[in-house]
């Protein structure tokens, strides 16, 4: 098993009873904690028209997290490009890179990050933006590239910042685009596990080396709930599981406290949702996490794992990330001792 990095994905979720400000404060606390633990990056996802998330203005959240952390890379996971002008995105992230050099990531996605009615309000007349994703990614690459590749319209700040750009996806289409452009590819297996194997194969087999990247670079996003015991992990995972049920029953709400015997309380339909959508979810104690990480990596060989953990108590969420980091560090410590 090759060495891999680990990172964090967040939507700046609100717990039951929290205000938006409290949700953002919790996101800052999490970011500070994983920064101190040595995680590589933390990304924030763009979602709209949900009172359960505080990450709609993703650029503002990224800037706030950058200002409150020291070493960890911070970025979008991602900016939903059809909702935005490529020039404005380049200017925004060029500004962030100017203020926080070598700490900013720009991951780009094609989805709306919301329901269709909200997407209509955001995009107005730009309903075909999803079909121009590849072209608009290229536009951003140019805007943050060298002066020699610029056209008449330029991004200030932006030119020469070379903000690292990633392609997000949960389908084979996004894999093809990432491969063609020679960019790192982040696959959303946390909610769309079924096409990951095919998408990663397409990306790796069709990857074209570029000035940005010489070899394929795969980031796999998975769910991880870690605790000191299997029983505790099972208990605190109830909040995370409820999120996915809410998403796919169109009933999204704030994170709720976990309850005993959660799975036994679910309907057959709700159990089927979890079975179909949570294929890449690792829950358990240290040994379970270690074993399932090894199994996952032996199958997919990701260069990096970016982890989502929806846990009601912030202290338990931070502990989950701490356990995960310790497990991964121990894996590679033993690996080095065996060489």
UniProtKB/Swiss-Prot annotation:
Organism: Bacillus subtilis (strain 168)
Cellular component per GO, a single term: cytosol
Transmembrane segments: none
Name assigned to this protein: Uncharacterized protein YddN
PANTHER family reported for this sequence: LUCIFERASE-LIKE MONOOXYGENASE (PTHR30137:SF6)
NCBIfam families: oxido_grp_1 (TIGR03558)
Similarity comment: family membership: To bacterial alkanal monooxygenase alpha and beta chains.
Gene Ontology molecular function: any one: oxidoreductase activity, acting on paired donors, with incorporation or reduction of molecular oxygen
Lineage, uppermost ranks: Bacteria, Bacillati, Bacillota, Bacilli, Bacillales
